Regions:
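A short beta-strand-loop structural module common to alpha/beta enzyme folds
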Residues: 70-85, 239-241
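Gly/Ser/Thr-rich loops at beta-strand to alpha-helix junctions
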Residues: 51-58, 80-81, 108-120, 135-136, ...
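N-terminal basic/disordered segments at the start of proteins
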Residues: 46-67
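Extended, charge-rich low-complexity interaction segments
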Residues: 100-116, 120, 160-177, 262-284
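Long, charge-dense
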Residues: 127-176
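N-terminal glycine-rich phosphate/adenylate-binding segment common to multiple enzyme folds
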Residues: 94-148
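Extended, basic/helix-rich recognition subdomains
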Residues: 194-284
Length: 284
């Protein structure tokens, strides 16, 4: 699970655009205050839909299995993060269909952070959109708000590993480097495979350790595979216990105005000049 600055993101985008082919890929607005949300008994009568990145799918499905009436869940491919217009289009299409197919009060629970502003512009015509007030999904898995996530940052850069990352991330880092080269070479030829490995090495140079985010609810199911990733990438392996609290709260409606952004029709998600997640008016 990748995080970093501009140069780092360039390496990531270049690498994943190439690897995406391997697996068959094809203006400033005024701030507005968010609404009071779920007053009275409105929540009890609301129809809800969850739209989330598939990287969160293992954890969300575990939590939903313990709910009496979990919301319907739609998962979008992780690789869409590298194609923001396609991500916005896919997300918007699910919102539009949900509104067209249902009457009455509606809420869309969003299993995404700001994600590099990839979802800026998505909006609803009738539903309320509920977003975690987070820049990415790492705090969701750790159970931390953005301030807590910032305070918990480790010395040096951490390559985060989670069950969803292991299942859905495009770079086959569970394979040793010579095996990855062989996969690339068969698809693209030796010259391009060499360039892809060079991009990988530059990417991994940004990290000092690989940290597996574990949940008690998941047991030991992914430990061996996470260790293989650390070994194959030559990064020291570590573990940290995450928490299901944030994602569980999202599944139950995300009613906290401190931890969740509630967007009324005509608003979208963005961040202000200080980097705080906020609601803004959709461009006309």
């Amino acid at each position: 699970m990748l995080r970093g600055g501009g140069a780092h993101r360039t390496f990531v985008s270049t690498l994943l655009a190439l690897i995406g082919n391997l697996w068959g890929l094809p203006r400033e607005t005024a701030l507005r205050k968010g609404p009071a949300f779920f007053d009275g008994n409105i929540w009890n009568s609301m129809k809800t839909l969850l739209i989330a990145c598939e990287v969160l799918r293992p954890e969300l499905e575990v939590l939903a299995s313990d709910m009496r009436n979990p919301p319907p869940m739609n998962f979008l491919e992780q690789r869409l993060h590298d194609y923001p217009e396609k991500l916005r289009s896919a997300f918007q299409g699910l919102v539009d269909a949900f509104e067209q197919e249902n009457d009455g009060p509606l809420a869309v629970l969003c299993g995404y952070g700001l994600c590099g502003r990839g979802l800026c512009g998505v909006h609803a015509s009738r539903a309320t959109l509920v977003f975690p007030k987070l820049h990415d999904c790492i705090p969701l898995l750790l159970g931390l708000d953005q301030k807590g996530a910032n305070a918990s940052s480790r010395e040096g850069a951490t390559y985060w590993i989670s069950p969803g990352w292991l299942k859905y991330f495009l770079v086959p880092f569970h394979l040793e480097s010579y095996r990855r080269f062989s996969v690339y070479e068969k698809k693209f030829g030796a010259a391009k495979a060499a360039r892809m490995m060079k991009a990988e090495n530059a990417l991994l140079d940004n990290y000092k350790n690989a940290c597996h985010i574990r949940w008690p609810e998941m047991g030991d199911a992914y430990v061996d595979e996470a260790r293989k990733v650390a070994e194959a990438t030559l990064l020291p392996y570590s573990e940290i216990w995450g928490s299901s609290a944030y994602l569980a709260e999202l599944l139950h409606g995300g009613q906290s105005g401190e931890r969740f952004l509630h967007l009324v029709p005509g608003q979208t998600i963005d961040m202000d000049v200080e980097g705080t997640i906020c609601a803004v008016a959709c461009p006309a």
